[in-house]
Amino acid sequence: MNMQETKEISAYKQGLRGKILETAMNAFGEKGIRAVKMDDVAVDLGISKRTLYELYDNKEQLLFEGVKVYNEQRQILIKEKTKNCGNVMEILLTVYRIKVEEFRQTNPLFYADLVKYPKVARFLHQQNQYIHTEMQKFIQRGVSEGFFREDVDEALTMHLFDALGEYVMMNQLYRRYTIEDIFKNIIFVSLRGICTEKGVVALDRIIG
């Protein structure tokens, strides 16, 4: 086998890995993770189980790689959609719309199943550090723009929203309530507490 043939095989496998990730993540999002077997992914793609296992050792590795790619794509999407926002409240509205659409397209079982895979759970926990950094910038900008109170303790605020997010996930509230209701009755109510009068008016426009 010459070098050109080796490169072609490598490119083919790389392309196939991408197709496998896309197919698997679509299936996980539609049916829940535990409901989808590796065999199902192979059948959907028309490839053998052997080929699939040559590229991904097991379902957790496949899910882990898929979540990483999805997370990167979502960060790019949010940056692209918010780059022209004039203030933090416009950013909040944009991210809210993205999250609502994301939840509408995803089976609640997907979120319930995620925590059952330790490698994925650890990755998501690590991602919280990035989210914390972005949230701190968001709060600081909100203060400078007059939407958030100057006496807000950023560290305590981060702990509050961490606790809220954990409570929603651990109690699977997304299975009983719409994402709109969760945001309006939990997230936005808590956010209102750090808003100035100007911020409350802007937040009410978003909720309304």
Where does each model-flagged region fall?
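Hydrophobic alpha-helical connector segments
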Residues: E65, I76-Q105, M158-F161
